Amino acid sequence: MALPVLLLLLALPSRSVQDEELKLNECVCEGMSCGNGDRCQGQQCFASLSINDGAKVYQKGCFQVYEQGKMTCKTPPSPDQAVECCQGYLCNMNITAKLPSSKGQTLQGEAAGYSMETLIIVILAPVVVLVIFSVVAVLIIRRIQKNHMERLNSRDAEYGTIEGLIASNVGDSTLADLLDHSCTSGSGSGLPFLVQRTVARQITLVECVGKGRYGEVWRGQWQGENVAVKIFSSRDEKSWFRETELYNTVLLRHENILGFIASDMTSRNSSTQLWLITHYHEMGSLYDYLQLTTLDTVSCLRIVLSIASGLAHLHIEIFGTQGKPAISHRDLKSKNILVKKNGQCCIADLGLAVMHSQSTNQLDVGNNPRVGTKRYMAPEVLDETIQADCFDSYKRVDIWAFGLVLWEVARRMVSNGIVEDYKPPFYDLVPNDPSFEDMRKVVCVDQQRPNIPNRWFSDPTLTSLAKLMKECWYQNPSARLTALRIKKTLTKIDNSLDKLKADC
């Protein structure tokens, strides 16, 4: 009984599949085998694509025999023939056979052709854009420069026509006349701005007399007179601005401070230059002078006393309408001191100067990223313990540096026929261009000071100078002498020398 039932159950699905296979479907018929009709009936519908003599042939129709259709439909597509099959009413209407291999080749060919065009465009487009951009940039730059020069020329023309300005008769004046006028009619800090610009435009650069990391110094001529023109590099613009600001707002006319004439931002050789025009001193810097010249007692004292006088004038605050705030130099060294024809010196380069006024109790440090010269830095600067909000701290830094300059000068003073070669401070302890760490170790950690030669102690003047410089080098900043005290001490030494000569 169980066996017939089992056979019956196994036979049922077979008949169901057979019924499905025998079911006829109406299909879309397209192609040569369809005759005049566009429909056909079969057990399976198909859509085919074949390549005949290089041409694509599309056909749609039906398989009358299920097994034939089954075999054909399960055959994977070849490069030149493909068939898609389906079952259902007009199911092949919206299907299309595909030739993966043939299509891939066609697409690759198309892609190859397209890639070449794209490659040409990709190469040429940036070049064309770059050329256009460069041309436009050059035109814009030239236009800007032209407009800038036109503005400068128009301003000069305006300045020349304004009545009552000194600029209108500058050509008949000497620098001494102009500076004397500025001292009696204004702040005494320099020429009026319009005169400064006029003077600057009439200067001819003659020769370069010095170069440094922050710019160049030229000897120039104005109305037949020599002037010094310091041309600042673009990275030291803040120093130019600081010196210009300081000279134009503060009474700094002193025989031991470099005389300021004018400051201007001018255009030369299609570039903007920052000029600071001062008195010209043909003897050059104290650094250069000491390398070539030995000193007697009188010339040595004249140099150090004049430097001390200039520093004291900077440090002191003067009250009144012709007053000035207290100023700290912050970069005092032999290269920033110039030698005058009369044997005295004047202090130059105020690009790092700090100002302080007791009336307002304001400390004006400026906005200059430049730092002082590492070789001349005081211990508190090297170990970063300086009280940056206290003006006296900056003055004490100047005193440390003055002591080092005093040592440089004293080495070149002849006594008993003996003199040392010129050397910079700490020449025997640090390299030519010492690092911050080199100086910190020598000055702060080891607490070393420049060597005092034994022969100094056989000369009363050098003995006094050695004592004085040691009092400038105290590790404790507050223990150092003031600039005024140094000036008075040097004056006393100078007077005692004069008295000794008179007695002789």
From Swiss-Prot:
Keyword Nucleus: no
Gene, per the UniProt record: ACVR1
Location(s) in or outside the cell: Membrane
Root EC class: transferase
Protein's membrane topology: Single-pass type I membrane protein
Annotated PANTHER family: ACTIVIN RECEPTOR TYPE-1 (PTHR23255:SF69), TRANSFORMING GROWTH FACTOR-BETA RECEPTOR TYPE I AND II (PTHR23255)
Name the UniProt record assigns to this protein: Activin receptor type-1
GO molecular function ontology, one term from the record: activin receptor activity, type I
Extracellular side: 17-119
Residues holding ATP: 209-217, 230
Cofactor: Mg(2+); Mn(2+)
